[in-house]
Amino acid sequence: MSELSRFFIELGERWQRRWREARVFEPEPAPGVPKYFITAAYPYPNGAIHIGHGRTYLVADVMARFQRHLGRSVLFPMGFHYTGTPILTIAEVIAAGDKAVMEEYMELYGVPEEEIKKMGDPLYLARYFHGQSKRAMERFGLSIDWTREFTTIDPEYQRFIQWQFEKLRKKGLIVRGRHPVGWCPRHSMPVGAHDTKDDKEPDIGQWTLVYFTDSEGLTFPTATLRPETVLGVTNLWINPDAEYVVAEFDGRRAVVSRDAAYRLSFQVGVKILREARGREFVGRMVQNPVTGEWVPVYEARFVDPKVGTGVVMSVPAHAPYDYAALRDLGTVKLIPLIRVEGYGDYPAKEVVERMGIKSQADPALEDATKEVYSAEYARGVMREDVAERVGAHLEEPARSMLRAVFKMYFAGRPVREAREFIARWLTEARLGGVMYDIMNKPVYCRCGTEIVVKVLEDQWFINYGESRWKEAARELVKEMSIVPGEARAQFLATIDWLDKRACARTRGLGTPLPWSSGWVIESLSDSTIYMAFYTVVKRIRQFGIRPEQLTEEFWDFVFLGQGSADEVSKKTGVPVEALKAIREEFEYWYPLDSRNSGKDLIPNHLTFFIFNHVAIFPREKWPRQIVANGWVLREGEKMSKSKRNVLPLDRAVEMYGPDPLRATLALAAEVEQDLDFRDAEARRNAQQLMSIYTLAQRLVQGAEERPPTWVDQWLVAEISRVLERAREAYEKVRVRQAAVEVLYNAKAVFDQYLAMVEKPSRQAVEAAKAWAVAMEPLVPHLAEELWATLGGAGFAALAPWPKLRAEPAALLAKRYVDMLIEDVKNIPAFGQGAKRVVIYVNRSFAWVKAALAGDVKTVIGAGVPPQQAKKVVDLVKTLGDEMRGLIAAVDHFDELEALRSYRNYVEKALGAPVEIYGADDPAAPDLGGKKRVALPLKPGIYVEK
């Protein structure tokens, strides 16, 4: 640990202790005082929280602290998510004596060997990392109200979740039935993102199976995402070297890869009859079930047996990979199916040739495929004549009847409509079927088993596919604030594709499903409205209310205002006063003002949060904002346990100190961007914070009482502008921008000020106090130290947002002086060495005010001598927008007084003595004729070599 780190750690511990002793962050409802309620995703205590968690919590903490400065009563609570399998899986692995995992936990998280052995008990493991994570949050300086802390296996919380689920069930939003889910074969249970390694959400997709059949009745099921192209198939592909099986499923004998048979076995009954290599089936002829055509089976080593069924249909007119492969074989046959504006009859051939693709091994085929598939899906229309390709193998009148159906529902239809029709028709005609798969494979359970898709027959689901529920969720997404704004489209897209989701498991920690024994509510289903629980858990405990008293009537009254306190008290035994107090607490804090989490939770937790709020609560209690931040990299690489580069938050605090760590996480990227945490930047930021501390000491020790000078006024005005920009950044959750303003730009202003004065003034100390408040959301421990050092009363954390006045005249004076210095430096004689500089000031500021209109006649009418009028107008035109705005905001400006006030600064900048005269002073010498050429804001300058 460096001396610098030790300094900031000790500073942090001192102020954290004082906050704790004064209960600074434990708010009570304050009628008449505006509130702000913010939460961030509670962590799973299956390991130590790391700097990725730290970033999410920092953004929430910055927002919470800023809102306190605006005079709001702020609630920022935290709990711990024990539910589900993450904790249980790790405990099982440790209990089994897995040395690799045990060493990983000892190395990454610093777990002592004697402790790791006890972690085979899942509750021991959870409580260990619960405590460690809480300590890390405290040391990090989060302004959390710990009086509302809970875990998701606390009995009070379980009663709350059971109430929520009963509400959903009574609304018809929980159903039991058949549905595909991500599945861990080892544990025989559904899994979601929080059950997988790297929290990867299993993306369940649906293949359409098309049953091609050979002359012996053997079926070759191809798996496709584009069933509308089946009418253009010219051949099938099979990998000659891969392992295949002949198996019975769906009433057929079928050829599929061994891997496909395994995956299908979780969805339909599969009986393997024999094994074979793919080459056994190469050369066979198979019949297209839609057109009746016979097509060959070709070999292709590019076929992946782990994708689909391992049997692929080839459509060279509309699939670049197929076209390139058949061109290599010299057997291209093209059948046009889809018209797309901007393309000819054979889009695949056209794009392959345009891109100059020479072989099937060319990586550019990926881009070609994306282009063709995207264009055909977005703008493609099935050709009118495709129906004539249907049913050539059928006898009349069956052939004509089938073609009539295809003419009506397929030919001339947009691709997306044709796709839906033929997929449904193939299944209903038993000429095809459905196969589910993990489209973002491989996805692994935390136990290490690869996830598959299982079709569950008797599972409990939350039906996120219910249309009216979806519409209510869309309403909330459209009206709430979402940071970043571009994430709104992702929420709407997630709402569109969400369907039934398994909500209960048969193993793991959590809340029992209230109406069906043996089921435990899973982790992404018991974490959707827990923000409401924060508002009441403290009172429930204070009043000593037992879990069995937390009935449906209790929650209905507290959260929905249903029933009377007297009635509920009689049914539950909870005192009327307690019921009213708890109800009032909820009413004060809800709705939630901001929900903060990582962007990876948009496709699951955050969208479920939206759905469940609109289902349970009235509109006035719907959440107001979501903030979804980007990921955290470390030294340019994704953090992962396998790379051993995960940086636990507690260790990071130990390495850098809390404020340097906070500053680095704030400065590295804006909220929506991924953040690359670098050691060198953290150490540079620590030096910057120390220089701020040193500067404050210098201000206090050297400050003197004096009438404010132009330089003092400039400091106050400039800091006022910095703080205004910082406030705007905080309000927009532009955390990096706010950090740049208060930690770097404000420091630069103070540095410049101290370089211009011999001694700082009391006004400078007051400006520094304002600065301390503005930096408090980001680096609260340093801010408290500065606040106390500078004479601030109470805590900086509770100080109102500072109000400094930016006097335009003070800003104008500094800009004017800097312009003058630049003008002097641009004089050739100055560059040859100056003995002294003589400046003549024209004090006719009214001329410049008149010239803002830009009209010479107006300027002359204002009393400006005609020979000077055009010069003044031309001068004003050369000034920038900022300077012109300052001139417009100032009624009177004495250039001579301002310049004399800045004399020391000017002399330091020029490195030469400076003499200053009024151009209207008859006693002033006119050196080089410069006295008479002086204009307002454009002094006459004489350089003596």
UniProtKB/Swiss-Prot annotation:
Main location, first listed in the record: cytoplasm
Motif 'HIGH' region: where in chain: 43-53
Keywords on record: Aminoacyl-tRNA synthetase, ATP-binding, Cytoplasm, Ligase, Nucleotide-binding, Protein biosynthesis
Catalytic reaction annotation: tRNA(Leu) + L-leucine + ATP = L-leucyl-tRNA(Leu) + AMP + diphosphate
EC number annotated for this UniProt entry: 6.1.1.4
Compartment list: Cytoplasm
Enzyme class label: ligase
HAMAP family: Leu_tRNA_synth_A
Protein's recorded name: Leucine--tRNA ligase
Species of provenance: Pyrobaculum neutrophilum (strain DSM 2338 / JCM 9278 / NBRC 100436 / V24Sta) (Thermoproteus neutrophilus)
